């Protein structure tokens, strides 16, 4: 399934992938919207 990862995130089937990167299609243009996830740590002193 790892080789099929790009196709799955374009179709939005894999919720882990599609949460990280959403394909937004409006009219004839498609853009990739990144939702940054992970640790949001405060700045180190």
Curated annotation (Swiss-Prot):
GO CC field: cytosol
Keyword ATP-binding found: no
Region listing for Disordered, in residue ranges: 21-45
GO molecular function: ribosomal small subunit binding
Induction pattern: Induced upon entry into stationary phase, this is controlled at least in part by the RpoS sigma factor.
Disulphide bond pairs: none
Subcellular location: Cytoplasm
Organism domain of life: Bacteria
Keywords: Cytoplasm
One GO BP: translation
Keyword Secreted: no
InterPro entries listed in its UniProt record: SRA-like
Knockout or disruption consequences: Not essential, a quadruple raiA-hpf-rmf-sra knockout strain is significantly outcompeted by wild-type after 4 days growth.
Role, per record: Although this protein associates with the 30S subunit of the ribosome it is not considered to be a bona fide ribosomal protein.
Self-association state and partner proteins as the record states: Associates exclusively with the 30S subunit; there is 0.1 copy per ribosome in the exponential phase and 0.4 copies per ribosome in the stationary phase. This is also true for several other K12 derivatives and strain B/R.
Family statement drawn from the similarity comment of this UniProt entry: Belongs to the SRA family.
Protein name per Swiss-Prot or TrEMBL: Stationary-phase-induced ribosome-associated protein
Species, as recorded: Escherichia coli (strain K12)
